[in-house]
Every structure is written in structure tokens, then in C-alpha cells.
Regions:
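Short aromatic/hydrophobic "clamp" motif used to bind/position activated sugar donors
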Residues: 19-21
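Short, acidic/turn-prone active-site loops that include or flank metal/cofactor-
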Residues: 1-3
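Catalytic-site signature of metal-activated, phosphate-bearing donor transferases
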Residues: 5-11, 24, 31-211
């Protein structure tokens, strides 16, 4: 049973019980501005759209603004309109309904300290290293000119196709830290880009190589 199976089980269960669904992880907190935006949508009783929410990362007790740390995710939707991609890794909520963006942030406190973050990502990297990407059926299209999620999928697809497993994490770090201005988040911005791209992605590539030995 993977993340997709669990989410879709809950979605289908509450399709019969609720008009709307808002999906959060345990380490995510809504800002007051986002709560206000959600209340306006619910009060309108209009169910024509599904809604993307801006996820902002809190890393080492600092809210990050650059380096690709913030992205949009479909989290609020009328029941019976949305499911999660049935994949092992990098799942997204998908819907045929038109999408709109909500004001306010969803703050994601990704770990209480760097040691716990490293432990969890070490375990996570082992799962990712076992995935055979060519066999994964994705529902979200990879589209540079699409919405935020489709654009992220496009860049991830390009990253996975890059031939050098040694250079991929280095290029990703350079892209996030310099081109996506991760350095503007100061010292914590460097640590985030280093651990999230260079360290984490190198660890995945090393485990992929180890699995072939």
C-alpha cells in the first residue's frame, strides 16, 4: 500500500460524507490569509473549480522564498472531482476541473531539526532508488508552458533523462542556488539547496549504482 492508495481510499470514503475536501500533511499549517481565502470559497457554494495552494518551506526555523522551495499544489476541491496519481513516487492530486489559485500560504515545517531531516531523507532515498522510472505511468503531463505542477514535471523529466548520474545533482544545485536565487535566503538557503539537491540527489544516484552491484 503506497501513498496514492492511502490518499485515494480516504478521498473516496469522504466523497460520500463531505461536499469539499482539504488535504494536509501533519507538518503543514495554514496561514490566516489562506484560511480566509478558503472560507470565502466554501461560503460561495460554487463548485466549478479546484484550487491550488502555495506550499512554502520552513527549513531550520526559517521560511524560504527562493531556490525553488515554494510551489503550488492542488489541495482543496469539491468531492468526487479529484484523485491522486497512482504512482510510487512524486504523486500529485489530479482533476479534470478548471484550476484556480488561492491567496495565502501553506507553511510546511519539513523537519524540527537537520538530523531528523537527514534520517527521513536517507530512508526516502532508498525508496526512490528502487523505482524504475520508465515503468511509471504519470497522470500529470510534463509541460513547460503548463501550470506550476506540469512545469515541475517537465523539469523533473529532463533531469531524469540527463545521462550523467555524477553531474545531475551538481547541475541541479547550481540551478536552484544561482538561477532560482537560493542564495537570497542567506545561509539557510545554501543549506537547503545543498542538502535538498546536491546531497539528497547524489545519495539517490549512489544507491541506484549500489543496487546494480
Amino acid at each position: 500500500i503506497n501513498y496514492s492508495n492511502q490518499r485515494n481510499f480516504i478521498i473516496r470514503k469522504y466523497n460520500k460524507l463531505c461536499d469539499w475536501q482539504l488535504h494536509l500533511d501533519a507538518d503543514e499549517i495554514l496561514t490566516q490569509k489562506l484560511i480566509k481565502s478558503i472560507n470565502i470559497i466554501l461560503a460561495s457554494e460554487e463548485k466549478k473549480h479546484v484550487y491550488l495552494i502555495k506550499r512554502s518551506v520552513i527549513f531550520m526555523k526559517k521560511k524560504l522564498f527562493f531556490g525553488g522551495s515554494s510551489n503550488w499544489h492542488l489541495r482543496l476541491f469539491p468531492s468526487k472531482t479529484t484523485l491522486v496519481e497512482n504512482t510510487t513516487y512524486d504523486q500529485h492530486f489530479v482533476s479534470s476541473k478548471s484550476k484556480q489559485y488561492l491567496s495565502g500560504d501553506l507553511n510546511d515545517f519539513i523537519s524540527s531539526n537537520i538530523s531528523k531531516w537527514i534520517i527521513s531523507h536517507n530512508n526516502y532515498s532508498s525508496s526512490i532508488a528502487k523505482v524504475k522510472y520508465k515503468n511509471i505511468k504519470k497522470t500529470v503531463n510534463a509541460n513547460f508552458f503548463g501550470n506550476n505542477i506540469e512545469r515541475l514535471r517537465f523539469f523533473k523529466k529532463m533531469y531524469l533523462k540527463f545521462p550523467s548520474s555524477f553531474l545531475k545533482p551538481i547541475i541541479l544545485f547550481i540551478y536552484k542556488y544561482f538561477f532560482l536565487l537560493g542564495f537570497l535566503d542567506g545561509k539557510v538557503g545554501f543549506y537547503y539547496c545543498f542538502f535538498n539537491s546536491l546531497w539528497f540527489r547524489t545519495l539517490i544516484e549512489a544507491k541506484k549504482y549500489e543496487n546494480k552491484l
